A protein has these predicted regions:
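Short, flexible, surface-exposed loop segments at domain boundaries
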Residues: 1-201
Length: 201
C-alpha cells in the first residue's frame, strides 16, 4: 500500500486493488470454498461479473501506486474538467520510460475531498485553481503531466457501479516517497510491539 508493506487494516474500504492469485489445491484438501473455474464470468446481482473468481489463493495484493511503482509506470494526465471543485480527469497509464500508443485513455471522477500531494505538503483543488494550474470551471489540457494516482470506488446512484474515483494525486517523486515512508512506519509500529517474522519488514 503506497509502495510499502501493509496490513489489510491499513487499506481504506473501496481502494482499487490489483491482485495476483491462483486456484486452490485439490478440492478435497482445500480449506477455502472451491468455485467453478469460470465463476468470474458469471454475473451476481448488482455486483456484475468478476466478483467471485475461482483463484482465491492470493500471492500479491497491491493498490494502484504500488502496482505502478513495481511495474515502472506512471499516469499521464491529459485533461481535467471542473465544476464546483469536483469533476473528471482523463489520464493514461504508461511506462515511465516512454509512451505506449496502445494504452487507452481512462476517465475518472474526483470530489472536493481528493488529496493532492506536492513534496511533503498536502494541497487542495482550490490551491491548484488559485495558482492557475487548473480551471475554476470547464476543461483544461494537462499535456501528459506524469503523476501517481490513488484510485477508489464509491457508491454511485447513477447505476455506474464500476465507475472509479481518484482519491489521491502524487504530483512528484518526493510526494510518493514521503507516502511510502509514512506507510513503512505505520507497518513497523505494531511489529515493534507484537513482533514480526524475519524478513517481513
Amino acid at each position: 500500500y503506497h509502495g510499502a508493506p501493509a496490513d489489510l487494516r491499513d487499506i481504506p474500504l473501496g481502494t482499487f486493488l490489483h491482485v495476483r492469485s491462483f486456484l486452490p489445491p485439490d478440492p478435497k484438501t482445500s480449506v477455502v470454498p472451491v468455485l467453478p473455474v469460470n465463476s468470474k464470468d458469471e454475473a451476481h446481482g448488482y455486483s456484475g461479473k468478476g466478483t467471485r473468481p475461482a483463484e482465491n489463493h492470493v500471492l500479491l495484493l497491491e493498490d494502484e501506486p504500488s502496482h505502478c511503482l513495481r511495474e515502472g509506470k506512471v499516469w499521464k494526465l491529459m485533461e481535467v474538467e471542473l465544476k464546483n471543485n469536483e469533476g473528471t480527469i482523463k489520464a493514461r497509464r504508461e511506462p515511465a520510460a516512454g509512451g505506449d500508443a496502445t494504452v487507452e485513455e481512462e476517465t475518472m471522477s474526483f470530489d472536493a475531498d481528493i488529496r493532492i500531494w506536492h513534496g511533503r505538503e498536502r494541497i487542495t483543488v482550490k490551491d491548484l485553481i488559485n495558482e492557475g494550474i487548473w480551471p475554476k470551471n470547464g476543461k483544461q489540457t494537462l499535456d501528459g503531466q506524469a503523476v501517481q494516482l490513488g484510485i477508489t470506488w464509491k457508491p454511485n446512484y447513477g447505476n455506474e457501479y464500476d465507475h472509479l474515483y481518484v482519491s489521491d494525486i502524487w504530483l512528484d517523486d518526493a510526494a510518493m516517497l514521503h507516502a511510502t515512508d509514512l506507510q513503512t512506519e505505520t507497518h513497523r509500529a505494531p511489529c515493534a510491539v507484537v513482533g514480526c517474522p524475519p524478513g517481513s519488514m
